[in-house]
Each structure stands twice: as C-alpha cells, then as structure tokens.
Amino acid sequence: LAEAVFFWGKVMDANQAQSAGQFPESLDRKANFPPGTIELASAKMCTAQQPQAVITNYLNLLQKVLNGDTGIIHENEIGPVEGIDTLQSIGAQSHLSSLGKQALGSLAVIRLNGGLGSSMGMPTAKSLLPVRGTLTFNDLMIRQLECLRKETGHNVPLIHMTSFRTDEDINLVMQQAAYCNPEDLPVTFRQHQHLKIYLDDLSPAQESRDDLNWNPPGHGDIYAALLATGIAQKLIDAGKRWLFVANSDNLGATVAPEILGYMIHYRCPFLMETCRRTEADKKGGHLAKNKSNDRLILREVAQAPTIEGEVIPEFGNIGRYHQFNTNSIWLDLQSVVKIAALHDGCIPLPLIRNIKPVDTEDPSSRKVIQIETAMGAAIESFPGARALEVPRGRFMPVKHNSDLLLVRSDWFRENADGTISQHESTGGAPPPTISLDPRFFSMFGDFSSRVLHPPSLVHAKSLKVIGNWQFKEPVIIRGHVVLETQNQERGQTPDLVTQELVDKANRN
C-alpha cells in the first residue's frame, strides 16, 4: 500500500488541491471527485490482495477517468488498414504449415473463461453450457487438445483464464474431467478484479454487498495475470514460447499450424485474427491504423465518438474499416515479458470506460464506471504486430440462444477431433439469419424447454420465430420462414411447430 500511495503522490496532491479549491490544469474542473479517491481505491485494491503491478496499472487508468479521459478514439486520429495477409494466401505456402507443426511443442493454448452466461440466463460460467447434445464448450476444448496431442505427439497444454465469478466452477469441472496438463503446468489461473467507481461523484463503490463493488477488468488483464501469477515463467521454464489465446465460446478457434508458422517466419510478436466486416458486424469494434505512429490500433464501440447519444456513422463504415477483431490472438511470450518489463510489469493498454448499474440485476441501481481494457488493444504496444484475415469458419461465437440453435442444428457437424464445422450439405452457403422471440427464448431455461428437437437448417436462409412456440418434432426449414402465433402469454402451453405449419410459413 505504501508503495502505491507514494507512486501516486502527485494524484493525491490533486485531490488535496481540489479540497482547497485549487484544480491543476491537467484535471477536469467538472470532475468534482472527492478527496482521497486515489488513497481509498488503492487501499481497497490492496485489501483485495491484488498484485502491486495490477494496482499501479489500475490507478493509472483511474487517474485518466478522474482527469476526464473517456478513452474515445477520434476519427482524425486513425485511418483504414490495407494490405493485410489472409489465411487463404498463407495456407498455400506449405513451408509455413510445416514450420508451425514442428513448433507445436513450444505452443500453449489459453482460453478466456471468465465470463458468465448471464446474457443467456445462466448463472454459471458460459463455457459450461451444453452446445452439442450434452457436450459443453469445455468438453469440446478438452477433446480438441487431446486429439491434437495424439495426432502430433506434442504436449500442447490447455490453460483457462478464469475470473472471481467463474474460478470455482471451472476448477471443479476440470477436476471432475480428470484433466491434467503436461509438465505439471496449472490448468487455470485467475484474472484480477477492478474496483467500480460511482458515476455521479467518482468515488469508489461502497455497496453493502462487496461483490457488487468489483468488476472483471476485461480480457486485457491477461498480460498482467500471466506475469503476476507466475504462469508466464512456468510456461517459459516448460519450453513454451508461443501462445494461442481465444474466447471459450468461439467454436471456430482451433490451433492452426500455418498461423504459428507464419508468426515464426516473420518474427511476429503479436498476431490478431480478423474477419471482414459485414452489415451484421457494423456495430462491433474494428481495426484501424494509428496516424501518429503508423501502428495497428483497435477501436471498440465504447471508444467511438457519439453525437446526441448515437455512435458516429463512420464507425459502422464497413467499406473504410473492413476488419474486425475475432479476439483470437497469437503471442510471442518472450516479447510479452520484454515489453511488460518496460512498463511496470504490465502491457500499456487504452482505457475502456463502461457505464453500468452497480447491480446489473437492478437497472435502477446507482450508475458506476467499470474500468476495463481489451486484450486485442495490445496490438499497438507491440512493434511489428500483424493482423491476419481469416474466414468466418474461425469465428463462431455463441452469444445468444439464436446462435445456440444454429450450432445445435444440422447446419454444423461435430468432427471426431472435437471441432465443429459447417456441414458439407450446406454447399458453403452463409449461415441463415435466426431471430427468436426474446420473451420466450432469451433465457436458456426457456430455450431448452421450447427447443426439444432443433429444426433442420441445412436449406434455410432465415428463420424468424414470433410468439410462444415449441420445437418438439423434426421439421425442415427451407428458404425464408416466419413463424407467428397469437399465443403471446408465457403461462400458456406453447404452440407446436409442425412441418405443415413450416411449409405454410415459407416466405420464398
């Protein structure tokens, strides 16, 4: 605590100056943050046993908030990205795949497993959601790694980064699966936690329920967590140099030797897998080029300027900003250690300022600022970092139950190696657009009771479900289908979807 307070003495001087009615020029005069904000936040972080490097980094981000920094990346600061390589182009270079296969023994896989399935009505870790029959995301990840080891003879470890919300669940499940990593490497490590800040007076959150005072710091914490927990050093000691990091709910994120070979061949310290944006992606973050240093930069929607509460139209210009981050990245662990050593044990990352109710289950509760960072934003911290455009097959996230319906259907097939791929019967067509009535399908429990038998979607272009329906028997969706019923009450028995009704609802 003493070290943190001493390091941030200048900021505390600013608090003292404010109490005396004097504002330094560097601080926003409208902030009106209470005296002692930095000391109180530092003390709370220390009490929560957060590492010194994490506290220092958090206080740095907090100072930006107190100074009025919103983390916004303005249009005149960035430009479009051109001329990035594609997986298709490097896949034709057989020497890259061979190089990657030879280096698999020095690779480790890390899955981001800190999120709950709350958006789908699940109180547990999202990776415990059944996605194919009884198989969960976790089951599929384990199967993939075990098949990779058997096929290649290389002991590639699988390590989960958990959060204070998911750590117990994930460790229990991995123990039940009797999963162990080679070289006695740990199966999990836990990311840190950030203190919430009240929006109205910029003081640290002090709710009676202590868990409401904290938020996960965003997946940008992976760098600090790797270093502070000692995982980075353990991996290095075990001969691991390369990391493949991906979201636990991305079924398309698998080890690709040709990408690893590409990194090694070009001595790339950081590689981000990107996909080409479509109209459906225009509300999400995008890749750009920083005009000040010509480096790649990531702009998330929370960092986009707004006009009268609406994000500027340039943000959604998919012609200008045509690449988005899949959140699958490849890292040179030696470069991570080297760059972090230059910045007090952390990789410098831009501020993401998320405003939410202090109790997310009570929208009327007091608003707070959640101080977060994004893993992909580190692309601008690594000289020589690259982006690689990959096909949509490597980006198959399950964010909503509409995604889950598609994954459970025959549009996908489950392969022997634990991977999920588009079924050949689809002819390579883009996935159908699926819209499920949120009143009856948004929560996993409701979805499970209403989708007892997923419909066939191989020949579907779109499916829209309005009202209280139940899929209980096999039906085939062809073309564009809209199912609408007058049954709009949750307490009523759902209407049964039959093939006859589906054929009548066809809008081709």
Sequence positions of predicted segments:
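Structured alpha-helical segments in the cores of large, soluble enzyme domains
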Residues: 109-113, 137-147, 222-234, 375
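Conserved core of the sugar-phosphate nucleotidyltransferase
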Residues: 172-333, 337-343
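Conserved short loop/turn motifs at secondary-structure junctions
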Residues: 157-166, 248-251, 392-396
